[in-house]
Amino acid sequence: MSSQIKPIKIYGQGGPNALKVALIFHELEIPYEIVVVPYADIKKAEYTAINPNGRVPAIHDPNTGITLWESGAIIEYLVDRYDSSHKLSFPLGSAEFYHSKQWLYFQTSGQGPYFGQVTWFKQLHHEQLPSAIERYVKEVNRVTAVLEEYLAKQKLASGSDEAWLVGNKISFADLSFLPWYTIMDFFLPSDQYNVKNYPHVKQWQDNMDSRKPVQDAKKVFKLGE
């Protein structure tokens, strides 16, 4: 990535969605700087002027003047703007172009909300609600089963251990799922969720975790501590 690119500001360093964006920064070697937003301040006027929804992350790109929030929208912007070689993306109009968006939207509408809710009801809610926990634990396993079945088909088709969601390479679609899976073991006991029950998902995660850009991003945007 050109050294002439000014660092993109990312607001927020904690949580899976900030890491989700950071993975793209590191994979594409996009310079960035972190603006720490304390949890107590995310609903204050200074930050809601940037993100009216009062959530992290958000970004401001001084190279284009664009400010964005919602991690999925940020990822689409970053690959559209900074991945002209299609390292993590696919040519406009190709089947893979649309399939990668399909999986990203499944992550943002399926995995993220359900995994977030199980985390809330397991760790943060003021009282234990077994029925709520049971529902979201089931959804965590259902979403993972969808990925397990699809990755098994991809592995069979590719004939290698590196099965990816789209085509024969890692893409932003794969990376978008990794942060929530990174912390599930911290929040759910093995009798509720165990990645070893999903061998293709585990291999997929291991393949992503073995990448240096992923390791570097996780050192900065730490989860589960």
Predicted segment positions?
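GST-like domain detector, emphasizing the conserved glutathione-binding G-site
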Residues: S2-E134
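GST-like fold's C-terminal all-alpha helical module
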Residues: W103-D206
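C-terminal helix/juxtamembrane-tail motif
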Residues: P213-E225
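Phosphate-coordinating loops and pocket residues in cytosolic domains that bind phosphorylated ligands
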Residues: A49, S210, K219
